[in-house]
Amino acid sequence: MTESKAPAVVHPPSMLRGDIDDPKLAAALRTLELTVKQKLDGVLHGDHLGLIPGPGSEPGESRLYQPGDDVRRMDWAVTARTTHPHVRQMIADRELETWLVVDMSASLDFGTACCEKRDLAVAAAAAITFLNSGGGNRLGALIANGAAMTRVPARTGRQHQHTMLRTIATMPQAPAGVRGDLAVAIDALRRPERRRGMAVIISDFLGPINWMRPLRAIAARHEVLAIEVLDPRDVELPDVGDVVLQDAESGVVREFSIDPALRDDFARAAAAHRADVARTIRGCGAPLLSLRTDRDWLADIVRFVASRRRGALAGHQ
């Protein structure tokens, strides 16, 4: 009797920021595309509603309200006529427009596990791109590093998808001392006004939570997914004694003696910040997918999709 082997853990390839036409970058993206499609084949079947089950853009039939339904979808006419609360089901558009807001601030140029957070952000963007690319769906991106913002118009086609991902992967590092501003990047998605679609926010969300208002405005019109990319050192400090640490965005360098008390304080503060981030995102009506550099990111995506689908099926029973 032979023991079954555990599935191999998948790690994102290093994108090695460089020239957009670098053959090595193109090869890394092709490898990533094949990996995503092989791992998730049969999970979504090209259906974007499998990623974020929910309403589309066009009104459909009404049904009885169930706890957890979005009150913005209330069908007041049917509710008044029947004296029972009803919600209007929405029909998904045949063609979906997906916009990625990708945070490439200096805090993502960091990683102590299998890759940098930057690589994980590119991998997450690639997964969303390949999963939402069927049926004439359009994809676009806003990439921000705090000093500059690059906009890739939403278009269709495999060549466009690869160009968009290469643009994300080669976004230059911000100059020293420049902090990212996620609120500005999210707010840029509102102009010009777009048809209803999907907005995916990819960030480590480590900065101030000053992006709630623009995120809420986006969520009022689009389906939103937030993807959090983290490294173990974002949530806990190593037990290594004296160290010199540098703030990736401000450039400030400080010496620390990491003792148990400091580790506990850091862990509590990190946990509190992550809880605030999750609470704020869910308060805007968006789900949160957490990916880490020390975990199998594709397995985490599969679990997220499965959980969302179970919730969608339960809501329709």
From Swiss-Prot:
GO CC, sorted alphabetically, is: cytosol; plasma membrane
Pfam families according to UniProt? DUF58
Which InterPro entries would you find in this protein's record? Answer: DUF58, vWFA_dom_sf
UniProt-listed PANTHER family: BLL2464 PROTEIN
- Please give the family membership noted in the entry: To M.avium MAV169.
Task: Return the protein name.
Answer: Uncharacterized protein Rv1480
